[in-house]
């Protein structure tokens, strides 16, 4: 039995969307295109045909409403999967902005994914990525709590980290990026693929999350009856 409890409607709506897709999409290829690629008109067509009829009202309302303040005007959230799902989150937007800054300065961060070993990754980091953190504008952004929030760091935690580092947040972020890009092989490091390539390894399908692997698809689908989800606090569950 697997019980997911979360007060955050956004988190649970994505979980429920994945569960419905896992159960009702015709095969692994369709599932991978929906959540691995996460873009293209075909995702919306498959949502309407296979997934939407099986969503609860709360989840359906979430995906078919807008992220804009009124929720009634603006593009629907499900449209994220047409435009590029992984670009829509605050983290995705921050990564996209970082790549834009890189292009403006003539840097292609995706090249680190082609490094064959740790020494090549380290050399690329020192030549291309490390200088990025010496940019005055980038250092200013790194000191801003909004940047931390985009990375999933709550403001209170950001303040603690800032105090612990004695205001050296740019150096802290620089070391985290170095660790991500240098200390782990790129073959199965899907976090690095998203950060430096803004995608998963679609060609080899090695640097992808376990739930997207074809060899796990049948087992996951078979265990769906054991899963239940609740939008509630743990104290009230």
Range-by-range predicted roles:
Residues 2-6:
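Conserved SAM-binding motif I beta-strand of class I
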Residues 10-217:
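Class I S-adenosyl-L-methionine-dependent methyltransferase module
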Residues 208-236:
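Adenosine-cofactor binding site in Rossmann-like domains, unifying the SAM/SAH pocket
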